[in-house]
Amino acid sequence: MKSINILSFLLLSSTLSLVAFARSFSSENPIVLPSTCHDDDNLVLPEVYDQDGHPLRIGQRYIINNPLIGAGAVYLYNIGNLQCPNAVLQHMSIPQFLGEGTPVVFVRKSESDYGDVVRVMTGVYIKFFVKTTKLCVDQTVWKVNHEGLVVTGGQVGNENDIFKIRKTDLVTPEGSKFVYKLLHCPSHLQCKNIGGNFKNGYPRLVTVDDDKDFLPFVFIKA
C-alpha cells in the first residue's frame, strides 16, 4: 500500500509539472528558437509585425495605433506652451482628441542596424519623426519622467530610455493578430507596461505596475 501511495504522488507531481510547463509557453513568454542559418549559432526571438503582416524594421516610419474602438494613434503634443513639445498622447474618438498620429521610428545605438528586423523583447529607442527646429532636434526620443509619464527628451544610447515590444493574445476588430504592448525597460530595473491615463485633462501614455494593465497597439507603416 505504501508503494502505491508513493507512485500516486510521483504521478501527480509529474502531471502538475507538465501543466506548469505548458502554461509557461504563450505569446507572453515567446519560445526562443534557434536560427535557421547554419552559420549562425545565435538564438533569435520572433519578429514584430506591422498591421499588414510585414516585419517591423529599424529606421522605417510607423504610426503606433490603439486598435480598440474609441481609441486612436499616438502623437506628440505641446502642453503648457513649452519651447519644445514633449507630451506623448493618444488620440481618442472625441472632438478635442481626434487625429492621425505622429510617425515614429525605432532605432538602436548603431547606425549600421538600419533596416534590421525588430524582434519581440529586444531593446529599441522610439523617436518621433517630425520636422523640428535646431533647438528641439534632440527632443524627439521617448523616455519616462519621474512621474511615470512617457515624454520626449530621451537619448539614443541611454539605457534608461529603452523600450521593448511584446506580443499579446488580442485580435483587432478586423481580425489581425499582430497586436502588441510596449514596455519601458530601464537598465537594471524591471520592465513596466505602457498604459494610459487622463492627467490634467490629457490622455497620457504612462507606465503601470499591474502586468495585466496595458494599452494594445498595432503598427501601421507611415
From Swiss-Prot:
<keyword id="KW-0926">Vacuole</keyword>
<dbReference type="InterPro" id="IPR002160">
    <property type="entry name" value="Prot_inh_Kunz-lg"/>
</dbReference>
<dbReference type="InterPro" id="IPR011065">
    <property type="entry name" value="Kunitz_inhibitor_STI-like_sf"/>
</dbReference>
<comment type="function">
    <text>Putative inhibitor of cysteine proteases. Does not inhibit papain. May protect the plant by inhibiting proteases of invading organisms.</text>
</comment>
<dbReference type="GO" id="GO:0005773">
    <property type="term" value="C:vacuole"/>
</dbReference>
<feature type="disulfide bond">
    <location>
        <begin position="84"/>
        <end position="136"/>
    </location>
</feature>
<feature type="signal peptide">
    <location>
        <begin position="1"/>
        <end position="26"/>
    </location>
</feature>
<keyword id="KW-0646">Protease inhibitor</keyword>
<keyword id="KW-0732">Signal</keyword>
<feature type="disulfide bond">
    <location>
        <begin position="185"/>
        <end position="191"/>
    </location>
</feature>
<protein>
    <recommendedName>
        <fullName>Cysteine protease inhibitor 9</fullName>
    </recommendedName>
</protein>
<keyword id="KW-0789">Thiol protease inhibitor</keyword>
<dbReference type="GO" id="GO:0004869">
    <property type="term" value="F:cysteine-type endopeptidase inhibitor activity"/>
</dbReference>
<keyword id="KW-1015">Disulfide bond</keyword>
<feature type="propeptide">
    <location>
        <begin position="27"/>
        <end position="42"/>
    </location>
</feature>
<dbReference type="Pfam" id="PF00197">
    <property type="entry name" value="Kunitz_legume"/>
</dbReference>
<feature type="short sequence motif" description="Vacuolar targeting signal">
    <location>
        <begin position="29"/>
        <end position="34"/>
    </location>
</feature>
<comment type="similarity">
    <text>Belongs to the protease inhibitor I3 (leguminous Kunitz-type inhibitor) family.</text>
</comment>
